[in-house]
């Protein structure tokens, strides 16, 4: 019996082994046990069984002992157990692929029999291997794989061990069976080392990787009639991995991979040509399979419902196509720099011993080698929305390629020898869908054409797809040995929790697809495509990590190049192969940490963050906002702007620049073939990478400052969110590629086409005819409306090219041409400390760039090749808001004025009451000063008693008309912005400066003052100084009588005119409006005067109510007004005055809420309309932002054209804008301005556009680099700035003008930037809004400075020179203008000696005036000190 069984074993095992004899078999029949020793297996048979790739061959397989145990009575439910003690496998790599694998001996042994009992028993076998050692030998390295305690067993579809009958699913309708297996092991050790060839690269480091528990899950689908495998699914699952890689090990890994790449590529071509036939028989689409199953199941549904349920169960776990998967639950990779022996100088700037940690969570690699190109991917592992997006995009690309092929067949009229007569799968799908959004160009070729000219069998087109997914990742910044032990910050991470990313969404999703025909590798196929999706990634710009990473990668690259040279490997990177790429990104952030400094640390932001809510980048025309129609409209917009024309040489552009609008943009916009024409018998060529046109579209991008401690970490907006589109191409590379093709082509047979010729011709080719073809082309681009005009333009261009030749060196084409456009209004907001942070960031980026260049040059051993770029930026409008510190005159001058007893202080405006209620009384200017003393004392007592019970209601008193007396129309206009800018200070106690306490706020000077101490001390101080205030008013009234009488008479002259103008602007009825009273807010319109004042109240504390404002009564009831004090937060006053051509647009302040979050009344904007009030439910952490006053200056421009040119180290920036307007909002709250609650913050098109502009209003040109030395020697290093203002009529308040200097002042000694500023036909009106020093001042009078042509130059020594541009005029006109000058101007033409004598005569007079001025100043200071001493007797804490 034993002998018979041994013969049967020999019969079957002889196909797998060598030299197997009966004496090597020890068999116990009854026990069901057997043992074999010293087995040598057949290598070729194992290759066929394992289906190894053809670049790998088995040379030896040995097993020392094998034992088997069979449970004869339980074969249906329990597996046969096969135990192997030690298995050794030796393999080698093949430079040329070996012959493909033959048919599996298992299928041969079955004799094409059906899947029966014997096959079930053999397939359910349980295998145990104590150790497996696999050695692989290559010409460059040798590697070994060692596995311990390996087990292989059958499992159910849920990958659990169970009864053998549950480990397979058989569907008799399909004639297929599914089986599931799992392989596990305890330890896997991988080691690789370089081959010792003596004279070759001696520096090698062994590469080691040890993993703990892992498993492989295998699902097989066979045909039951012959046991052949139709498809398989293999999943390689690894648990947590920790891998430390040094740079030398990483070099070794790259070398090994590179040595195998060539052989693997050849093997891949061989595999594609021999795609498995069983897969071809499988129905291509899941829908077809489902319908097939439903057809079989439907016919038997009534008779056998269990068969239908079995089919559904089979469908649930069906393996629709072969695939391979690798899943790593967590990978901690530590990359270390262990290179200590390097050439001197290379590692001088390198962090020695640096290390970087990379952590990847749920990292997956999926490979689908035989996917039908038109098939759905819903059955793929972890199918997600990203796969659907890529599938739709890839389908459009394949349909575009198919349309080109069909068009070529129609044009040639030839039936190809490889035609299979099968219509396109894509075409059938598209026609069945009949999408109305489909491009007509994609539909038309298939309609009405003859069946004789059909493309190849598109339904046989295959694709091999690789999917890479990373659910979460953290890449940390580089750490060094001397660094503190704390964990370094992240360099790149995913913010899953912040953006609430669903579990099926990966942080990184990558799909790479290649196409092939298994029947014929020579058939043209679509270009491979790459799809990438990024979600929630945050990158932190760390210069140290970037420098370390740059040197690390350069070292790897240099080592790899040396390795290629040693082994004479091909460099595949030099091929100009096109790859269709699309990148989708959502919620991206790039953080730029800002330098920390101790000075003003609380005000400095910690980081500048670039955010993008959505981004699409692609080099195809099949993506949202990246289509041909989008490019056409963009190109028309740029062509309509004369600034971007190549023949435009007006300032700020100069002749000789790059031609931005290259014709390559036009080729892509209208889908014109730019490749050289091919003979008709050859199919169209694939596009080259040099012809790529990249488009990047941002849905919303913004820049924000984060981490400002003074604002409790609030994010402050720098650039408001706006959409942005970028289009870029490589015209120089494209033209060089076309020129190489022409050199290779026959000149007689190959004539340049119009599509190739027109981009090549340029001004540089034909300088004598610079205005002919190209300029004419760009002129006609303004009216582009379709393909017909474009073809005419190209014909014109080609005619000029034919005469010059295509190989002439082009000088007006850069390496990169880029168009940047946004249809939205761009807003920029900046304060002083943010400005300083940007300056420091610029220095950091400059140092980083310089260091990267030095490191790269030192590692490569050669200087970097000069790169050129041409960038055009086009915005419809933009604004820059400068958030300056309130001017001292706008905050503190009132107190100074009131202390100096001047009632003319602030033109006696009711909104100028700034100090305590005593000072508020002194600030008013009624007709009768004596009467005001009597009334103020009465009103002061009445109000102090009634206010605590009135809940903040206003007392309507005070003569508005007489308070504004004495200045006339121009004076009132010049005050409007000042009155507005001072209201914020009056609405909070920020102007007072008591000692510091626990709770602080920001006052007008940016200093910290306590809030609680303010309330307590002011409430007591008010009661103490109530009587003292009356005495101080009596003492100062004599000094103000004359000023009051003067202002009264002057005001009466202009009152009627101002009143009527105000009524027209505000649409006010002439009658007095009643005062509206509410619990939450009070609006008190005042009529009958030249201005309109509005009050807004809020709920108050008891301490705030104790120092309310003083109501001043006067003779006329219609002129009564209530004035609030400086210490009260109850009311915000808004003065709405005449809006004339010279007035400054006034702003308004929203109501200020208390900590309880009380909703305020609707805000009234500067148009007299109600607008939503500020959100008053502000947390205490945002309190500083609410009360923080800033002086806002907004610069607005229209039609912004921006050009950047880079030529190696030379950088040129040119900017042009059509109109410049200034908007001065005065002093407003920072929080309400950032939230757009100030009138005037919304952009509006100017209603006074100047249509007669010959030149743009603003022109700016900045040059830096060696080429800028033509302007001055210092310009090559620091740059040269040239600014031109033409036809600008600007108005500036003196407070804003004085604030610009400190705003732009750097904290470090700035470098001298040579510059030239030209003012052409412009005027500047200065309006003084700072209170006068003396009470006798008649008030500020606006000063207008008109300039016909003034030039301000700054030389290298920092000296400014002011002069006129006399060179622009003929010499005769200059002489005539000098003769027409008045005699007083001719003092500059007097000889030097006479000038000296005249100065000597005037010297005594000047000295006398100087002495008198000093004496007057000393007297004024004494008077001021006396008054201060008198006031401090009653209020010790009073300060100016």
From Swiss-Prot:
Name listed for the protein in its UniProt record: Bridge-like lipid transfer protein family member 3A
Keywords linked to the UniProt accession: Coiled coil, Endosome, Phosphoprotein
Annotated stretches, region: Disordered: 267-307, 430-456, 751-780, 891-1008, 1106-1180
Domain Chorein N-terminal: 3-95
Biased composition regions of type Polar residues, renumbered to the chain: 1151-1180
Function: Tube-forming lipid transport protein which probably mediates the transfer of lipids between membranes at organelle contact sites. May be involved in the retrograde traffic of vesicle clusters in the endocytic pathway to the Golgi complex.
Record field: compositional bias (Low complexity): 287-307, 985-995, 1134-1150
Subcellular localization(s) per the UniProt record: Late endosome
PANTHER family to which the protein is assigned, alphabetical: BRIDGE-LIKE LIPID TRANSFER PROTEIN FAMILY MEMBER 3A, CHOREIN N-TERMINAL DOMAIN-CONTAINING PROTEIN
Coiled coil feature spans: 837-860, 1401-1435
Subunit-level organization: Homodimer (Potential). Interacts with UHRF1.
Phosphoserine: residues carrying this PTM: 444, 446, 755, 758, 988, 1103, 1106
Biased composition (Basic and acidic residues): 911-920
MF (Gene Ontology): histone deacetylase binding; identical protein binding
Gene Ontology CC, one term: late endosome
Highest taxon of the lineage: Eukaryota
């Amino acid at each position: 019996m034993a002998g018979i069984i041994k013969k049967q074993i020999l019969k079957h095992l002889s196909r797998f082994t060598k030299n197997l004899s009966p004496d090597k078999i020890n068999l116990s029949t009854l026990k069901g046990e057997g043992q074999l020793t010293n087995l040598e297996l057949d290598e070729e048979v194992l290759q066929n069984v394992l289906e190894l790739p053809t670049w790998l061959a088995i040379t030896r397989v040995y097993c020392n002992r094998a034992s088997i145990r069979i449970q004869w009575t339980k074969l249906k439910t329990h597996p046969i157990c096969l135990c192997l003690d030690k298995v050794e496998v030796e393999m080698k790599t093949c430079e040329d692929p070996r012959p493909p694998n033959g048919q599996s001996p298992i299928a041969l042994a079955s004799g094409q029999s059906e899947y029966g009992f014997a096959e079930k028993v053999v397939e359910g076998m349980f295998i145990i291997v104590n150790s497996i050692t696999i050695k692989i030998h290559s010409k460059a390295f040798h590697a070994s794989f060692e596995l311990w305690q390996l087990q292989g067993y059958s499992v159910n579809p849920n990958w659990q061990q169970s009864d053998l009958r549950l480990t397979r699913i058989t569907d008799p309708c399909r004639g297929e069976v599914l089986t599931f297996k799992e392989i596990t092991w305890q330890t896997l050790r991988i080691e690789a080392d370089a081959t010792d060839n003596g004279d070759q690269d001696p520096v090698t480091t062994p590469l080691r990787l040890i993993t703990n528990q892992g498993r492989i899950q295998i699902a097989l689908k066979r045909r039951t009639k012959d046991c052949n495998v139709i498809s398989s699914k293999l999943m390689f699952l690894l648990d947590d991995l920790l891998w430390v890689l040094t740079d030398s090990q990483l070099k070794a890994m790259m070398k090994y991979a590179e040595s195998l790449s060539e052989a693997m590529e050849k093997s891949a071509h061989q595999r594609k040509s021999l795609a498995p036939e069983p897969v071809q028989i499988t129905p291509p689409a899941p829908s077809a399979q489902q319908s097939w199953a439903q057809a079989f199941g439907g016919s038997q549904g009534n008779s056998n419902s269990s068969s239908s349920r079995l089919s559904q169960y089979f469908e649930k776990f069906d393996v629709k196509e072969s695939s391979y998967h690798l899943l790593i639950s967590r990978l901690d990779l530590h990359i270390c720099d262990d290179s200590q022996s390097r050439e001197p100088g290379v590692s001088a700037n390198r962090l020695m011993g640096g290390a970087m940690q990379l952590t990847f969570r749920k990292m997956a690699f999926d490979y689908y080698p035989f996917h039908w190109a038109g098939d759905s991917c819903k059955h793929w592992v972890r199918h997600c929305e990203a796969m659907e997006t890529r599938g739709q995009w890839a389908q459009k690309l394949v349909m575009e390629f198919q349309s080109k092929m069909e068009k070529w067949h129609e044009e040639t009229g030839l039936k190809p020898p490889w035609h299979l007569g099968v219509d396109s799968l894509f075409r059938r799908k598209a026609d069945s869908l009949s999408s109305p959004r489909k491009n007509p160009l994609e539909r038309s070729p298939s309609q009405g054409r003859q069946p004789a000219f059909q493309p190849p069998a598109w339904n046989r087109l295959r694709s091999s797809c690789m999917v890479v997914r990373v659910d979460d990742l953290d890449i940390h910044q580089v750490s060094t040995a001397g660094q503190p032990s704390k964990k370094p910050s992240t360099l790149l991470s995913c913010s899953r929790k912040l953006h609430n990313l669903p579990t099926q969404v990966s942080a990184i999703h990558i799909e790479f697809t290649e196409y092939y025909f298994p029947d014929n590798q020579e058939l043209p196929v679509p270009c491979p495509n790459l799809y990438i999706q990024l979600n929630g990634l945050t990158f932190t710009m760390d210069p140290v990590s970037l420098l370390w990473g740059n040197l690390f990668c350069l070292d790897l690259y240099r080592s790899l190049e040396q390795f290629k040279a040693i082994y004479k490997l091909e460099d595949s990177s030099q091929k100009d192969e096109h790859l269709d790429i699309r990148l989708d990104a959502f919620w991206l952030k790039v953080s730029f940490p800002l330098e920390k400094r101790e000075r003003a640390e609380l005000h400095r932001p910690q980081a500048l963050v670039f955010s993008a809510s959505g981004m699409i980048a692609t080099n195809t025309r099949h993506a949202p906002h990246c289509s041909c129609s989008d490019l056409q409209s963009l190109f028309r917009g740029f062509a309509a702007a004369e600034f971007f024309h190549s023949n435009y040489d007006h300032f700020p552009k100069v002749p000789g620049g790059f031609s931005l609008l290259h014709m390559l943009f036009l080729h892509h916009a209208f889908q014109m073939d730019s490749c050289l024409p091919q003979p008709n018998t050859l199919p169209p060529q694939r596009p080259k990478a040099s012809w790529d046109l990249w488009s990047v579209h941002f849905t919303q991008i913004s820049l924000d400052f984060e981490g400002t401690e003074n604002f409790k970490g609030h994010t402050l907006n720098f650039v408001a969110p706006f959409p942005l589109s970028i289009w870029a191409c490589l015209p120089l590379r494209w033209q060089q590629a076309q020129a190489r093709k022409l050199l290779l082509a026959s000149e007689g047979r190959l004539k340049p086409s119009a599509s190739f010729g027109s981009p090549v011709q340029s001004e540089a080719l034909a300088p004598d005819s610079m205005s002919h073809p190209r300029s004419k082309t760009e002129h006609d681009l303004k009216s582009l409306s379709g393909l017909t005009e474009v073809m005419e333009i190209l014909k014109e261009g080609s005619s000029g090219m034919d005469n010059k030749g295509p190989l002439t060196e082009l000088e007006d084409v850069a390496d990169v041409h880029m168009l940047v456009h946004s249809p939205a209004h761009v807003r920029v907001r900046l304060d002083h400390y943010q400005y300083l942070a940007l300056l420091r960031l610029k220095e950091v980026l400059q140092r980083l760039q310089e260091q990267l260049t030095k490191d790269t040059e030192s590692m490569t051993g050669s200087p970097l090749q000069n790169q050129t770029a041409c960038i055009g930026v086009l915005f419809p409008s933009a604004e820059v808001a400068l958030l300056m510190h309130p001017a001292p005159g706008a905050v503190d001058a009132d107190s100074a004025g009131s202390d100096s007893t001047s009632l003319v202080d602030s033109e006696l405006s009711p909104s100028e009451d700034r100090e305590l209620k005593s000072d508020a009384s002194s600030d008013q200017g009624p007709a009768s000063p004596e009467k005001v003393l009597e009334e103020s004392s009465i009103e002061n007592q009445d109000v102090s008693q009634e206010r605590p019970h009135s809940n903040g209601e206003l007392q309507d008193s005070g003569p508005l008309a007489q308070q504004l007396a004495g200045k006339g129309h121009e004076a009132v206009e010049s005050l409007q912005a000042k009155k507005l800018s001072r209201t914020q200070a009056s609405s909070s106690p920020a102007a007072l400066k008591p000692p510091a306490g626990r709770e602080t706020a920001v006052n007008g000077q940016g200093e910290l003052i306590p809030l609680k101490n303010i309330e307590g001390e002011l409430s007591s101080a008010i009661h103490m100084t109530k009587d003292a205030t009356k005495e101080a008013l009596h003492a100062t009234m004599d000094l103000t009588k004359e000023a009051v009488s003067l202002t009264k008479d002057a005001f009466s002259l202009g009152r009627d005119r101002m009143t009527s103008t105000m009524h027209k602007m505000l649409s006010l009825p002439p009658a007095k409006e009643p005062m509206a009273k509410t619990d939450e807010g009070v609006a008190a319109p005042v009529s009958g005067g030249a201005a309109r004042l509005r009050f807004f109240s809020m709920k108050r504390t008891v301490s705030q109510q104790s120092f309310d404002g003083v109501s001043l009564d006067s003779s006329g009831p219609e002129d009564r007004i209530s004035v609030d004090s400086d210490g009260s937060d109850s009311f915000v006053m808004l003065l709405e005055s005449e809006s004339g051509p010279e007035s400054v647009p006034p702003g308004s302040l929203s109501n200020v809420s208390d900590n309880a979050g009380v909703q305020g009344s609707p805000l009234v904007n500067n148009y007299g309309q109600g607008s939503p009030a500020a959100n008053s439910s502000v947390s205490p952490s945002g309190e500083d932002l609410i009360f923080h006053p800033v002086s806002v200056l907004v610069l607005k421009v229209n039609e912004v054209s921006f050009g950047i040119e880079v030529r190696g180290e030379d950088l040129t920036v040119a900017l042009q804008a059509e109109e410049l307007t200034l908007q001065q909002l005065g002093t407003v709250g920072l929080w309400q301005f950032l939230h757009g609650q100030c009138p005037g913050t919304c952009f509006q098109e100017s209603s006074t556009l100047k249509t007669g502009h010959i030149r743009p209003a603003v022109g700016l040109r900045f040059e830096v680099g060696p080429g800028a030395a033509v302007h001055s020697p210092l310009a090559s290093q620091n740059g040269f700035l040239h600014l031109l203002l033409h036809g600008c009529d600007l108005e500036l308040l003196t407070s804003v003008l004085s604030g610009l200097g400190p705003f732009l002042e750097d904290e470090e000694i700035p470098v001298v930037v040579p510059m030239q500023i030209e003012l052409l036909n412009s005027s500047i009106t200065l309006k003084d809004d700072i209170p006068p020093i003396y009470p006798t001042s008649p008030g500020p009078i606006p000063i207008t400075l008109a300039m016909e042509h003034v030039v301000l130059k700054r030389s290298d020594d920092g000296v400014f020179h002011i002069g006129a541009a006399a060179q622009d005029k003929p010499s005769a006109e200059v002489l005539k203008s000098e003769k027409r000058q008045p005699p007083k101007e001719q003092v500059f033409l007097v000889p030097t000696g006479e000038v000296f004598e005249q100065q000597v005569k005037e010297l005594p007079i000047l000295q006398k005036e100087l002495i008198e001025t000093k004496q007057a100043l000393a007297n004024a200071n004494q008077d001021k000190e006396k008054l201060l001493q008198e006031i401090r007797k009653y209020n010790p804490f009073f300060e100016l």
